[in-house]
Each structure stands twice: as structure tokens, then as C-alpha cells.
């Protein structure tokens, strides 16, 4: 077969072990953030106007604003965004917020009001566009730039609005009785609770205040007692029949009861059921079929029933008995005495239907609507006397006013589902029917019908993403603004003003700023590596405003719930107090328009699994039978097994295959991105998997990234979606490449008005939020063809477009002289020498020159009392050179500050007389390197205030920046020219000309040669006969000129920005930022980890020759303790070791075949070997169709080790691992003979050796080690400060004091508690003694003792210290300490 496929070597090829084909495309991993914010902002107005959501909805809900008299009204028309002033990179550099100005068009309508009739007529309409502050924009990567730092708004999980039914689990009452309660939670507004008490009376509470009987609430809704009873109970008519009564026979109420007396048919008089017989459904059905209509009852059978209506004498209007009264001898007597022979009776039997509402009604003191309203008013506003108007207004504003109460669309949908209603989701307030339905449902629950809700079910929790959080915040800002507008409208002469004069946008802008700056959900982005960025954006937090608090959250909320399956990862959550409160979205999950998390499923039609994908939320999923993704299937999509493991209604069960409706799309849909990156996750204990997924987020990007041999296939997805690796925006040809940018001439999407050139700027040695290094390297070369989405450049922690957090290291599991005790890690010196785990960290130092009271500070090289040696790295402006090597104490930026006049010593006077003013009036406040940091200066930025003269350094930086911009412009211009003139010559070729440049003969047929005689700029002068072509030529000319001027304009704008001064904080004249790159080699004390939660600290770095070695003389790189595996149960690391060993073995074979090919030129063995490794799975590469160059490229990629992918829950099994080991020509035990590097002797047993992917974590000993002799002290206690940041001391605590006491080290102890701590006078004396060379000193009184005395005095205790001499005779009698 002809080898036709080509492979460009810019992506990593893996052998896939997965057997399950993936039907659904994995959604973009940061979709949650981007979609939510786009929906909120809606920057581009769609045709037909914006729908009512997001920002539009906020404006619509607050406007129109009318003044108090109704004489004028401010209406909202529309809003638009202007382009942002600075782009993302400029905002990062200048510490600005990346935001776009928001302009809102408002319309002010002034009315004429007729004083007599009150009729309004429009007098004047004014429309104006008003600036409403800046609205932060989201970058392409789903982050915000606030004051120059990248932040992420974490999505919040909160309880969905709607109605919830619950009980107290028998905890409230000593009898253990279940007290049921219902709660209606709106999106905003008052909560309504309806609950039972221990006596089975139903109460309502508004906003958790004092409870009132629920019947009072119903009365306030306009119902009376009889109507309430009618609503909740059925009624039957009992008729007088001779001496007894005729009762309707209702079989549904008698089910399961026992006949106490014999039951007699009222019509025939025969006994239909004997006394004591059980009434089974079958018996009741037989009685109905016989035609039994009514039963006969005696008077005493009526006792205990309740009247369903008032018993009234209609002629006199006298009420004998009221609805709800109980029937007993007395009441029955009244009824019979007044000649009533029909009684309406409530259908309460105390078994199926309880008398709760009737009892509540009889216990309720309120008789009518007014009493009920007054009662509610007193509960809500205690101490205010109610009037009917105020009580009614207050009650209506609680639940029935759209301004104050909003269920939201979600709330309404949830309520409809729970209460079986069908109300449009535009009805966002409560209705009387809703309240009645809630009470009815609650009473049914008490009667034993229905189920309570599970509040931890994901159907009852929803996600609030950026857009929604921002919407709520902006609404608050606008409401604050609304008050001010109303007041201003009333106080100002309304006829003369424009909307601009009424509006002060400060509150709205402040609300936005406050949200992004200080909300608990607006977090400093975790930017250690691309994975940590992506996980941070996909995080779901139950904390934050309107959410839970750590202390109050119980076990249930934190626990894994069956509905988490495919929606929230059960593994990835922090260890510690936040466990279970902060979660991560599962890989395939997405958030629907109501904020519920949905997971994808494949449809099953007629017992066959289709490729049709359906997204369902937890509520919808419950009714289906869902098969697992790894259920065995036949070729036609039917299930192999008769019974299939499936999930249904939150249970895992075996069910017949015919009952299946859906199937999971992929085994990894259960876990989050980080957990899906762990190979053999299925063989790890959950606790260790949790640590593994959390530690991958802390892996520092290494100097040389290397993708893992054993991956899971998720690596390219993470690298692409995180934005670390640069993907092509559209197809084209690479025109230029250097380390800082890639220029591509586009060949697709060439629309008019769009540049035909894509310039990708690469980030070079930029600092991330966590001080790790962000650096991108190009992968393409000039002339390469690229398609949309191809990887052009690798970023931090990526290798050929694959996520690469660590390095593959050769590991042996064996003890080694105790150096790997307790999870310590033993490393070979080779790892240090070859920079395997070396990383670059970039630290930023900034210094500001302020304007002080005594005069301006100055950044200069001229610093008093500093040697020339100390200034060797500074330029003439006093700023350090780029490339300078600096160490602790070196000056980075020289700065002097004026100091106040102080009395001068004679020497100073003399100096002043000789040298003039300068010597004494400034002090050195230069920026110096902090202790413990060594590095190289990689970048310096200088910022000047407007109007402050720029120094030499600032000018040089500016020139460099402008040159860079000019180069971009020139390159883009060159490509534009090449494209346009190429098209122009195509159009002119073969045309008859009618005009041309000077000296051109008319009528000549144009060809390349003819046209090329003239300079390109004159080609536009050619005119041709063909009018169609001529008009195309003119259109091309117009397009070209427009593109050219747009390019020039863009360049001028950028240059203007560079040259303009910078915005500075008040009082700052000039600011310098210095970036220092620190190279960190691995050293003892650094923390390392694998991907399976196997973490440890480097204990020693051993010379290569002392490390254990294999039979071929290869020394291992890492020695791990085998005891770290059994108790931790993370066997995944062992399988990874074996498979990595096989990969390296295969790589060695491929390397040998490459050498053979170079010798004999036969590529077929190489192609065959690679083909055998790749195999023929659903995702296998067609290596047999690769052309020769492509095979070589792939072989070159694999010669260090073959890359494989073993997806979670669908990866390599033991047999696959054995096959790979055999294929690589290795023993299938995966063990090898090792020799001791120091003695050369063979170790007793075979040792497991292989390759593990090791990470270096961001817990480096250099950042933690810290020592102090003298330093800053606390003001009050005069004790040294604590912590590395404050250059503090170590706390000598209570237990350390015990230790010294135990050793009897009295003087050491005294020194610790006085001189070394807070004895101010003593420490000065010690210093003086040391200077004198004396080593005796005396301790004084510790300052903390003085603090104690002062505290006691402030309590009013008179504490005096008396110096009394002790009598020697008395002293002799005191016990000796030594005894």
C-alpha cells in the first residue's frame, strides 16, 4: 500500500490501551467560565435586541425610575461597550484592570400633571448616553486581570430556590417523633417555613421569626375557616334514617381497617361484614360490585367526627355550631333538637387523614383577616402599632411584590416539579395556590404519603457562575444608585437637566470593584502550572456569600452523593477543614441554563446503544436505568449479558438488559481533569488518589519538560484548553519564527476587513502568580503548513502539546541505608548534574519614589556612604542591568530619601563646610536583595508619572518597545503587500489595458513580465477593458488602502500608549520593577511526589557511582522505600513502574533499529516494530500508511521511551502489562538484578525497577529555610516577630521550656526567657559585653512581665514591686534547689 500519511512530529503519538470508543466530544474545559460571563455581558447586541438576561435583565429590573411625585421618569434604552483602553498584556505590565467602559443610553421623560384630574401628558423627552463605569472583561483563558494580577471567580454551589420538605430526624422532641417542615426558598426575598410542632399543630414562620398558626397565614390570604376546611378535607353528608344515620360507603377510606362493629347495609338492612373482620381491598371491591351505597350507623358512631359546615338557623340567622366543631352527645343533641336531619361531616379518619389543619384552626386565636394581618405585622415589625393599610402593604410586599420577592425561573421550575403545578416560569412571585399546595403536601407527608427531599441531591443544589454572581453584585450597585437618583430627581429643576446630571455611577462601579477585589469567591489564580489554572477555573465552592461556612457544614453536605456521578469528582477535594466543601467539576459535565450540572449519556433505542448523546441533570436522570460505560456490547450495540450493572434512582443494581434506557459515554466522566491524569487510578486507594490529584496541581514547571511515558490521553486536552500551548487560530503557512513570536500567513478565513496575517507573541520568562516561570517555545519552522488548532508553541509544563508536569525517572524500590525511611527519597547526583529537576522561579521587586513632606525621593546612582563595589551592577540611572548576577544584600535600585534636620555633630558641620549641602540631608533607602535569594536580572520596567522627566533607562526601554511594535507592523505590511500584489498580478494577467503608468503603451496585453517592469506602487495605475475585472481591481485597492491605514493607526495608538506617562498611586513619582530569575536545582529538603499520592522529601543526593546499578551498568536515578506501598494501597505506582520499564525497553529497541536503518537504509523493520507497538485499537495511528520521513520522526520521538495512554477505568490490565514487557524483551516479573554501587556486590533479591513519572512540588526548601540572629521586635511585648516574611525568630514554647527544665539547664533557660526574648535593657548590655569581648552578662526584667503588670493595673489592681533584702538567717532555712 502506498505510504501517504505524513506526520509533522509536532504532537505526541501514544499507544492507546482504551477499549471503549468515545462517542461524546469532551466540552472545552473552561467553558463554565467563558459561557457564563459572555451570557452576562452580551457585548455584541444580537439582531432583534438583547434577551432579558444578564446585564440587560439588571437594567430592566431597576429602571424605569420615577421620582416621588411621578412628574418625571428615567427609562433604560440600551447599553454598549466601548473598546478597552489597554489590552491584556498592557494591563498586566501597568497594574491596571482589563475592563471596557460601559455606556448606557437613558431616556428622561418629563410629564405634565393636570392638577384637577391627575391625568399625565408627556411634556418633554430627552435621551442621552451616560458613562456607567468600567466593566471588567474576561481574557481568552477565562480569567480577569484586576490591578495587574490574574484572578479567577470560582463558581458557587448553593441551595436551589424552590420548596423543600424535610423532617428533624426525631431530634427535637424527646419522644423521637418526626416533625415535618416545608421551606420555600426564593432567589431573593423572605423565606417561608411551614412546620409541625410536637402536638401536630401546623405553624408558619416568616424569615425564621416567631411562629404563627398556618391558618392565620391562610386567613391573611383572604380565606375564612370554612373555606380552609373545604380546601384540605373532603366532606360527606350524614342523613337521619329513623333512629340511626345513613353514612355514604367510601371504600378508599376503609382500606386495611378492621370492622369494630358489624356493618349493616342501610338500604337492605342485611349485615355485610361481621364484627372484627379485616377489610381487605378484595372484600371492599366485592361490596362495591354488590352495589353497597350506604351503611347504617347509630348516634354514638358519629361521636368524634367534625362538622364540615356551620349549623345555622337560616330564618333567625343564629349560628348553633361552627365548622370544625367536634360531634359529641351535647352537639348532636343541639342538632337533633333543632330538627336538622342532614349533617355535613369532614372526612377525617385519623389514619389516612389527620385532623391537623382542623386542630390548628381551633387553636388559632385570630378569627378574621384583619386579626391575622395584624398578627403577622406584629411578628415582622414588633413595637409598631399596625393599621389595616400598613399591615396589608407589608404582607403583600413579603411574597407578592416582584420588586421584593423573586423565586427566579429555577425556583418556579423546581416548585412546579415538586408540587405538580403548571405555572409559566415568568411568574416569579408566590401565589395563594402555591402556599396551599405546600401546606397540602406537608400534611400528606405527615399522613405518611410521599417522600421528604434530600437536600444534598444535586437536583437541589445549583451552580452560580461568574455571570450570575456579577449580575447580583451589579444589581446591588444599581439599587444603591437608584435611591440617589430618586432624591436628585425630586430636588432638582427637572425641566433643565439631562440624564447625565441625575446619575452618579460611583455606587455601581464601586460594587463591581468590591466584588472583583474582595469577594470571597474572587481568588488570586493558582498559576503554578497549566493544570492548576484549569482546575481553579473548574472549581465549585460551597463557601462564600450566601453559602455555607466551614464550621457549620456537617458531614452530609461534604459527603459524596450518588448524584455526583458524572457531575462532580468524588476524588478531588482538599484535605483539611474544606474537605467536601470545595469540589471540582467532572470532565464531561456542563452547567445548564438553570445552573444545574448535567452529565452526558448515550441513548439506548430498542435494546441497542446509539451514538446519540443526551445531557441530563440529576433530577431528570433519576427516572432512567443507566448502564455503565464499560458494559460489554456486541458489534450491533446490544448488551452481551442478560443482566447489566446499572444505576437507577440513586441505587446501583443489576437489571435486565431490556430495561436500560441510557448508557454512560465514557469511564472517565466520573472524575475531574486532575484525577483523569492519573494512570491506573482504578488501582489506587481513594485517599491516595485524592492526594495525587491535589499534588499534580503543585508541580513546578521544570526547565526541560518531558511528557510521561505512561499517560492517560488527557494530556493534550489540558495543554490545549488551559492556553499554555499555543494553538493556531486558523490555517496558514509559517512566514517567520523566532523565540518571541510566530508570524503566520493565513490561508483560510480570509474575510474582507480581517487581517491576512496572524502574529502570535510568545511569553518569554514571565512571572506567574506563584513566581513560577512562564515561558513559551516555538515548535514550527518557516514554511510549515499549519491547520486550525495545530500546536505552534509549547508553554510551561508542556511537551509537544502534551501536559508535562514532571520527568520520567528510573526508580528502584528498595531500602538504602535508612535514607528512604519514612517516605524519604534518595536521588542520584546525575539528576542534579543533568538539570532533570531544575526549575526557574521569577521574583518581582518593586520600588517607588514618592513625594514626601521633606521633598521628593530620588532614584539615583549617587548614594551616600556606599562603595563603588556595591554599585557595580547599576547603570547611570541607578537601576540594575539586565543579566547582572545578584546575591543577598546587593542593591537593585538605588534610592535616596530626604531626612529631617537634626542637630549636627562637629564632624558633620566640617563635612558640610567642605562638600556643600549634599552630604547630610539624605539617607539611603535603596532596594536590596532579601536574604537567601540569588539570581539573574531578566527584566526591568520603569514607570513615570505624567509630566515627570524620563531618565535614560526609561527612554531605552521605550525605544526597544517601539522598535518591536514597528517590526510587527512592517512584517504584517510585507505579508499584506505580498498577498495583495500577488492577487493583483493574477487579475491583470492576460487583460487588455486601457491605461497605465507613465511611458506605458495603451492596449498592450498585460503579463507578469510587462507588469514587473514597473515598481509595485505603480501597478494600481493599470486600467483594463473588462469592466467587471476593473471594478474588482478597484475593490481590491479600497480593501488594501483600508487595511494599510488600519495597521498604521493601530501602530500609532500603541506607540502613543508607550510614550504616554503612566497612571500612578497618589504621591508616587516613579516606579521601578525588577524581575530576578532564580534557578533552583533539586536539593535535600525539597518535596517530590509521583501521581499516586506517593510523596516524600529528598533526604540525600548520592554520587552516581554509589547508586545501585543494573546488569548493563545503568545506575538508577531514584530509590524509593517499598514499605510506602502496602499500607497506602496505591498499587497504581507499581503498575506504572512496570509499564514505564516496558516503554523504555521498547524505546531502546527502536533506537537500535534507527541505527540499523542509518547503516542499511531499510526502514521496514522500524515501521513494523512501531506498528506492532501501536496495535489496532479504536484510536491507533495508521503507522503502516506513514511515509518514510514520518516513520523516522515518530521513531525519533519514541527512542527514549514509547508513549502510551492508559485511560482511567479503561486502561491496561495485567495481561497488557505482561505483553508489553515481553514485547520489550524484558522479564514479565518486571524485576531486575541490581548491584550495590559501593561494593559491586549483587543484592540478594530481584528488585522492581522501572520508570515513574516524578514531580517536583512547589514546596522548596529554599523558600522555607530561615535563620535569624537579631531582627525586628514586636512593639508591645518586645519579643521577636514570627515567621520568615517578618524575618522573625523561632518560638521557644511551653514544651521546649520543660525540656530545658528537665536537663536542669538553668542559665540557658534564663537566657531564652530574657535576653533572647524580651529583656530590652539586657539585650543591649549583652551586645555591649560581646563588643568588649566579655562573656558575662546579667538578665533583667522581661518586657512581658511589665505588660502583665500594666494589664493588671488596667483591671484596677494595684501592683507594686518591692525590693526587700532577704535576711541571711532566713535564707539558710530555705530548701536548697539541688536537694
Curated annotation (Swiss-Prot):
It catalyses: RNA(n) + a ribonucleoside 5'-triphosphate = RNA(n+1) + diphosphate. The keyword Metal-binding does not apply. It holds the Pfam family RNA_pol_Rpb2_6. GO terms for cellular component: DNA-directed RNA polymerase complex. InterPro entries: DNA-dir_RNA_pol_bsu_ext_1_sf, DNA-dir_RNA_pol_bsu_external_1, DNA-dir_RNA_pol_su2, DNA-dir_RNAP_su2_dom, DNA-dir_RNAP_su2_hyb_sf, RNA_pol_bsu_bac, RNA_pol_bsu_CS, RNA_pol_bsu_protrusion. GO terms for molecular function: DNA binding; DNA-directed RNA polymerase activity; ribonucleoside binding. Gene3D superfamilies: 2.40.50.100, 2.40.50.150, 3.90.1100.10, DNA-directed RNA polymerase, beta subunit, external 1 domain, DNA-directed RNA polymerase, subunit 2, domain 6, RNA polymerase alpha subunit dimerisation domain, RNA polymerase Rpb2, domain 2. One of its GO terms (biological process) is DNA-templated transcription. Its EC number is 2.7.7.6. Keywords: DNA-directed RNA polymerase, Nucleotidyltransferase, Transcription, Transferase. HAMAP family: RNApol_bact_RpoB. The RNAP catalytic core consists of 2 alpha, 1 beta, 1 beta' and 1 omega subunit. When a sigma factor is associated with the core the holoenzyme is formed, which can initiate transcription. Belongs to the RNA polymerase beta chain family. DNA-dependent RNA polymerase catalyzes the transcription of DNA into RNA using the four ribonucleoside triphosphates as substrates. This is DNA-directed RNA polymerase subunit beta. The gene is rpoB.
Amino acid at each position: 500500500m502506498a505510504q501517504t500519511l505524513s506526520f509533522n512530529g509536532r504532537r505526541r503519538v501514544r499507544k492507546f490501551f482504551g477499549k471503549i470508543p468515545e462517542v461524546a466530544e469532551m466540552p472545552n474545559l473552561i467553558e463554565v467560565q467563558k459561557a457564563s460571563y459572555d451570557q452576562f455581558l452580551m457585548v455584541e447586541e444580537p439582531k432583534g435586541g438583547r434577551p432579558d438576561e444578564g446585564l440587560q435583565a439588571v437594567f430592566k429590573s431597576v429602571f424605569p425610575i420615577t421620582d416621588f411625585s411621578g412628574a418625571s421618569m428615567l427609562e433604560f434604552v440600551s447599553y454598549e461597550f466601548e473598546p478597552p483602553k489597554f489590552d491584556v498584556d498592557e494591563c498586566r505590565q501597568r497594574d491596571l484592570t482589563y475592563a471596557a467602559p460601559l455606556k448606557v443610553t437613558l431616556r428622561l421623560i418629563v410629564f405634565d400633571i393636570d392638577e384637577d384630574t391627575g391625568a399625565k401628558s408627556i411634556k418633554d423627552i430627552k435621551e442621552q448616553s451616560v458613562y456607567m463605569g468600567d466593566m471588567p472583561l474576561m481574557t481568552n483563558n477565562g480569567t480577569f486581570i484586576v490591578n495587574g494580577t490574574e484572578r479567577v471567580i470560582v463558581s458557587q454551589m448553593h441551595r436551589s430556590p424552590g420548596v423543600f420538605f424535610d423532617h428533624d430526624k426525631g431530634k427535637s422532641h424527646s419522644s423521637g417523633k418526626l416533625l415535618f417542615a416545608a421551606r420555600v426558598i426564593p432567589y431573593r426575598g423572605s423565606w417561608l417555613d411551614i412546620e409541625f410542632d410536637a402536638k401536630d399543630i401546623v405553624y408558619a414562620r416568616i424569615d425564621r421569626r416567631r411562629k404563627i398558626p398556618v391558618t392565620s397565614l391562610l386567613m391573611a390570604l383572604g380565606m375564612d375557616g370554612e373555606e380552609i376546611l373545604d380546601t384540605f378535607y373532603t366532606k360527606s353528608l350524614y342523613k337521619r334514617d329513623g333512629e340511626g344515620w345513613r353514612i355514604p360507603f367510601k371504600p378508599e377510606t376503609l382500606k386495611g381497617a378492621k370492622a369494630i362493629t358489624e356493618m349493616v347495609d342501610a338500604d337492605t338492612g342485611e349485615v355485610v361484614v361481621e364484627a372484627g373482620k379485616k377489610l381487605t381491598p378484595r372484600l371492599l371491591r366485592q361490596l362495591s360490585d354488590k352495589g353497597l351505597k350506604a351503611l347504617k350507623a347509630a348516634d354514638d358512631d358519629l361521636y368524634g367526627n367534625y362538622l364540615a359546615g356551620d349549623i345555622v338557623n337560616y330564618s333567625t340567622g343564629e349560628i348553633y355550631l361552627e365548622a370544625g366543631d367536634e360531634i359529641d352527645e351535647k352537639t348532636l343533641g343541639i342538632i337533633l333538637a333543632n330538627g336538622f336531619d342532614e349533617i355535613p361531616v369532614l372526612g377525617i379518619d385519623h389514619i389516612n387523614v389527620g385532623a391537623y389543619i382542623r386542630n390548628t384552626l381551633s387553636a388559632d386565636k385570630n378569627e378574621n383577616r384583619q386579626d391575622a394581618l395584624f398578627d403577622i405585622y406584629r411578628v415582622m415589625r414588633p413595637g409598631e402599632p399596625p393599621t389595616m393599610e400598613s399591615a396589608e402593604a407589608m404582607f403583600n410586599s413579603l411574597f407578592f411584590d416582584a420588586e421584593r420577592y423573586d423565586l427566579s425561573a429555577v425556583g418556579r421550575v423546581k416548585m412546579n416539579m415538586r408540587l405538580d403545578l403548571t405555572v409559566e416560569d415568568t411568574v416569579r412571585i408566590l401565589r395563594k395556590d402555591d402556599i396551599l399546595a405546600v401546606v397540602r403536601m406537608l400534611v400528606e407527608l405527615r399522613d405518611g404519603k410521599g417522600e421528604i427531599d434530600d437536600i444534598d441531591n444535586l437536583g437541589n443544589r445549583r451552580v452560580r457562575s461568574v455571570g450570575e454572581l456579577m449580575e447580583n453584585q451589579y444589581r446591588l450597585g444599581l439599587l444603591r444608585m437608584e435611591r440617589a437618583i430618586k432624591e436628585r430627581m425630586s430636588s432638582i429643576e427637572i425641566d433643565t437637566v439631562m440624564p447625565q446630571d441625575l446619575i452618579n455611577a460611583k455606587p455601581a462601579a464601586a460594587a463591581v470593584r468590591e466584588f472583583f477585589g474582595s469577594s470571597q469567591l474572587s481568588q488570586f489564580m493558582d498559576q503554578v502550572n497549566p493544570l492548576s489554572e484549569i482546575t481553579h477555573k473548574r472549581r465549585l465552592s460551597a463557601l462564600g456569600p450566601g453559602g455555607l461556612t466551614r464550621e457549620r457544614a456537617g458531614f452530609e453536605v461534604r459527603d459524596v452523593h450518588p448524584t455526583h456521578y458524572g457531575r462532580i469528582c468524588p476524588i478531588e477535594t482538599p484535605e483539611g477543614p474544606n474537605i467536601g466543601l470545595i469540589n471540582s467539576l467532572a470532565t464531561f459535565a456542563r452547567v445548564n441554563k438553570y445552573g444545574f450540572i448535567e452529565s452526558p449519556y448515550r441513548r439506548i433505542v430498542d435494546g441497542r446503544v446509539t451514538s446519540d448523546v443526551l445531557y441530563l441533570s440529576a433530577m431528570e436522570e433519576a427516572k432512567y436505568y443507566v448502564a455503565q460505560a464499560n458494559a460489554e456490547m456486541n458489534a450491533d450495540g446490544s448488551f452481551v449479558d442478560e443482566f447489566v450493572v446499572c444505576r437507577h434512582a440513586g441505587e446501583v443494581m443489576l437489571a435486565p438488559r431490556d430495561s436500560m434506557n441510557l448508557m454512560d459515554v465514557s469511564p472517565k466522566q466520573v472524575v475531574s481533569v486532575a484525577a483523569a491524569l492519573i494512570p491506573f487510578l482504578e488501582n489506587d486507594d481513594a485517599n491516595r488518589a485524592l492526594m495525587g490529584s491535589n499534588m499534580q496541581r503543585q508541580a513546578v514547571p521544570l526547565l526541560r519538560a518531558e511528557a510521561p511515558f505512561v499517560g492517560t490521553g488527557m494530556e493534550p486536552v489540558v495543554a490545549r484548553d488551559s492556553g499554555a500551548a499555543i494553538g493556531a487560530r486558523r490555517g496558514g503557512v509559517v512566514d517567520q519564527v523566532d523565540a518571541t513570536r510566530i508570524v503566520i500567513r493565513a490561508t483560510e478565513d480570509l474575510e474582507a476587513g480581517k487581517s491576512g496575517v496572524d502574529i502570535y507573541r510568545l511569553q518569554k520568562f514571565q512571572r506567574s502568580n506563584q513566581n513560577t516561570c512562564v515561558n513559551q517555545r516555538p515548535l514550527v519552522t518557516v514554511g510549515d503548513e499549519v491547520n486550525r488548532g495545530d500546536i505552534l508553541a509549547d508553554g510551561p509544563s508542556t511537551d509537544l502539546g502534551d501536559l508535562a508536569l514532571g520527568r520520567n525517572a528510573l526508580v528502584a524500590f528498595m531500602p538504602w541505608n535508612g535514607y528512604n525511611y519514612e517516605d524519604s527519597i534518595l536521588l542520584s547526583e546525575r539528576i542534579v548534574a543533568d538539570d532533570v529537576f531544575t526549575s526557574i522561579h521569577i521574583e518581582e521587586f518593586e520600588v517607588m519614589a514618592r513625594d514626601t513632606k521633606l521633598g521628593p525621593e530620588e532614584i539615583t546612582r549617587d548614594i551616600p556612604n556606599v562603595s563603588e563595589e556595591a554599585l557595580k551592577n547599576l547603570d547611570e540611572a541607578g537601576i540594575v542591568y539586565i543579566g547582572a548576577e545578584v546575591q543577598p544584600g546587593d542593591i537593585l535600585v538605588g534610592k535616596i530619601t530626604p531626612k529631617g534636620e537634626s542637630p549636627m555633630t562637629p564632624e558633620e558641620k566640617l563635612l558640610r563646610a567642605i562638600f556643600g549641602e549634599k552630604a547630610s540631608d539624605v539617607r539611603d533607602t535603596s532596594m536590596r536583595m532579601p536574604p537567601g535569594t540569588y539570581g539573574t536580572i531578566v527584566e526591568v520596567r520603569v514607570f513615570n508619572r505624567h509630566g515627570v522627566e524620563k531618565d535614560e533607562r526609561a527612554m531605552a526601554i521605550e525605544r526597544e518597545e517601539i522598535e518591536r511594535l514597528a517590526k510587527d507592523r512592517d512584517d504584517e505590511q510585507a505579508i499584506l503587500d505580498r498577498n495583495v500584489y500577488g492577487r493583483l498580478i493574477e487579475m491583470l494577467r492576460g487583460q487588455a489595458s486601457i491605461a497605465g503608468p507613465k511611458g506605458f503603451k495603451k492596449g498592450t496585453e498585460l503579463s507578469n513580465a510587462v507588469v514587473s517592469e514597473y515598481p509595485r506602487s505603480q501597478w494600481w495605475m493599470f486600467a483594463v477593458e473588462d469592466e467587471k475585472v476593473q471594478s474588482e481591481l478597484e475593490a481590491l485597492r479600497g480593501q488594501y488602502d483600508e487595511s494599510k491605514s488600519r495597521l498604521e493607526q493601530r501602530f500609532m495608538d500603541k506607540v502613543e500608549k508607550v510614550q504616554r506617562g503612566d497612571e500612578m498611586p497618589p504621591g508616587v513619582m516613579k516606579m521601578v520593577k525588577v524581575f530576578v530569575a532564580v534557578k533552583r536545582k533539586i536539593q535535600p529538603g525539597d518535596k517530590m511526589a509521583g501521581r499516586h499520592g506517593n510523596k516524600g522529601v529528598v533526604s540525600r543526593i548520592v554520587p552516581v557511582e554509589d547508586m545501585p546499578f543494573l546488569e548493563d551498568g545503568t545506575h538508577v536515578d531514584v530509590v524509593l522505600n517499598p514499605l510506602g506501598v502496602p499500607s497506602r494501597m496505591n498499587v497504581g505506582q507499581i503498575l506504572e513502574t512496570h509499564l514505564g520499564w516496558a516503554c523504555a525497553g521498547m524505546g531502546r529497541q527502536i533506537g537500535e533499529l534507527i541505527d540499523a536503518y542509518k547503516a542499511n537504509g531499510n526502514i521496514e523493520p522500524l515501521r513494523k516494530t512501531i506498528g506492532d507497538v501501536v496495535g489496532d485499537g479504536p484510536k491507533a495511528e495508521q503507522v503502516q500508511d506513514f511515509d518514510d520521513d514520518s516513520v523516522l520522526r515518530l521513531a525519533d520521538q519514541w527512542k527514549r521511551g514509547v508513549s502510551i495512554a492508559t485511560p482511567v477505568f479503561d486502561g491496561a490490565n495485567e495481561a497488557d502489562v505482561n505483553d508489553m514487557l515481553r514485547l520489550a524483551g524484558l522479564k514479565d516479573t518486571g524485576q531486575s538484578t541490581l548491584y550495590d554501587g559501593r561494593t559491586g556486590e549483587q543484592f540478594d533479591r530481584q528488585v522492581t525497577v522501572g520508570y515513574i513519572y516524578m514531580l517536583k512540588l512547589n514546596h522548596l526548601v529554599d523558600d522555607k529555610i530561615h535563620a535569624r540572629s537579631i531582627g525586628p521586635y514586636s512593639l508591645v511585648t518586645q519579643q521577636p516577630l514570627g515567621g520568615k516574611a517578618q524575618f522573625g525568630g523561632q518560638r521557644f514554647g511551653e514544651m521546649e521550656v520543660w525540656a530545658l527544665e528537665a536537663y536542669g539547664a538553668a542559665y540557658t533557660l534564663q537566657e531564652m526567657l530574657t535576653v533572647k526574648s524580651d529583656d530590652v535593657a539586657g539585650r543591649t548590655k549583652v551586645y555591649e559585653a560581646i563588643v568588649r569581648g566579655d562573656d558575662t552578662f546579667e538578665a533583667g526584667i522581661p518586657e512581658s512581665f511589665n505588660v502583665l503588670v500594666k494589664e493588671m493595673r488596667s483591671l484596677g489592681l494595684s501592683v507594686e514591686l518591692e525590693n526587700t533584702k532577704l535576711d541571711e538567717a532566713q535564707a539558710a532555712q530555705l530548701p536548697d534547689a539541688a536537694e
